[in-house]
Amino acid sequence: MRQVVRFSLLFLPCAILSVVLIGAGVLRWALWGMSFGIDFQSGLIERLRIAPPAFSLVYTGTQSMQFFQDEQKVVFTVSSPGVLGERYEFLYTEYPTLRAFSEGAKKVEHLSVTLHAPETVYMRDTFSGAEGSTLSSASCFVHYFSEDVRAPGVEELRRVLKDVPSAVVQQVGVRAEHTFQVRVAAETAFPSSLLPEQGGTALAQSDAPDLVTPQGAVESVVYAALVRAYGADHVVRLAMDFVGSRFSHLLVRQALLLVLGALVLIFLYVALRFRWFFALGAIVALVHDACIMVSFMVWFGLEFNSASIAAILTIIGYSINDTVVVFDRVRQTILLDPIASVTTVLDRSQTDMLTRTVVTTVTTLLAALMLYVFTEGGSRDFSLALMVGMVSGVYSTIYIAGGCIALISRGKSGGQLLGL
């Protein structure tokens, strides 16, 4: 007969240990705060691409010329104040290549087209930084991608912007489009060397190593770093937006409501499948896991962002699965021996499931460990939070959920607990 491990002897010491760990995290948060990621801060969100120029447009007329481009055509509209002038449309089916387009554009007065790419490049492979723009004597670049063009990856852009504090780079959309999203917190201290010059004068004094830049300068710092790496004619700014502090606070509240909503649904599920005290034990264990993960992030200075929320929700699902399996064995053990005390039933059930718990946790930990070793940045922090959560999940299933049930059923047998 298998020897039963007396887990119940450590219910109280482990509960005290958990309170101390969580309390230490709360204390550090209260004294030094938490490092929130750009997801929960006000700041710049910019969508961009890095691509070579296909051609440039210059308009020297006295009227206003609007330029528009989509996936099928290029359109020029000439107008005066209060008067809509001529409209020139160049369909890609009629003007398939740069050469054909540049020849056709000669009929537009005061417009000059300068090619920067081979004449055989297809117009359908070109794109502009915005859907519409006003042309002037300054060059307006239109860019392109083709199979022979080397496009930078997300890791390369992260290296380019590594000196920009709080900059987060992600690839968005279809991978073949090579579109990136850059986020930078608004109130960030930038080294003066990163700040662009305006009219020959730097935005900051050279003897000031760091400063908090105004909101508009955040955009300039990111653009200057990209221009230094790729050149102004290769940086395509698709869209820019600033997220205010009010919106970022709303995201924090929504994240908290998301976690609370998940806990409520899990409580209802466990209560319907077992009994309310099982559900209470499960919820206490899940809240414990979430608090341990947050405390770990606070103590080790990890950034709390949307990936952290994903890690917490992942661990909540992982932990409740383990807890439900143990609770199911607890119910079976009670039906087999309704006279045994609740602590005895818990010890037997957890001993029976110990091998499964260890094997499942170790194999999942190995997967998370590989993610931690072979990635960097946000993915590495995510995997580290997962590993902490997995260890906490096993610990809480045995000592927190079990201890909660033992506390509720003091002096009762397993049969009395289930009303048998």
Swiss-Prot record:
Q: How does it sit in the membrane?
A: Multi-pass membrane protein
Q: Does the keyword Transmembrane helix apply?
A: yes
Q: Name one GO cellular component term.
A: plasma membrane
Q: Which GO terms describe its biological process?
A: intracellular protein transmembrane transport; protein targeting; protein transport by the Sec complex
Q: Where in the cell is it found?
A: Cell inner membrane
Q: What is its main location?
A: membrane
Where does the sequence pass through the membrane?
7-27, 250-270, 276-296, 309-327, 358-378, 388-408
Domain of life of the organism encoding this protein: Bacteria
Keywords from the named record: Cell inner membrane, Cell membrane, Membrane, Protein transport, Translocation, Transmembrane, Transmembrane helix, Transport
What Gene Ontology molecular-function terms does this entry list? Answer: protein-transporting ATPase activity
Keyword Ligase (UniProt): no
Family affiliation: Belongs to the SecD/SecF family. SecF subfamily.
List the NCBIfam families hit by this protein, alphabetically: 2A0604s01, transloc_SecF
Q: What does this protein do?
A: Part of the Sec protein translocase complex. Interacts with the SecYEG preprotein conducting channel. SecDF uses the proton motive force (PMF) to complete protein translocation after the ATP-dependent function of SecA.
**Assembly behavior:** Forms a complex with SecD. Part of the essential Sec protein translocation apparatus which comprises SecA, SecYEG and auxiliary proteins SecDF. Other proteins may also be involved.
Record-given protein name: Protein translocase subunit SecF
Look up and give the organism this protein is from.
Treponema pallidum (strain Nichols)
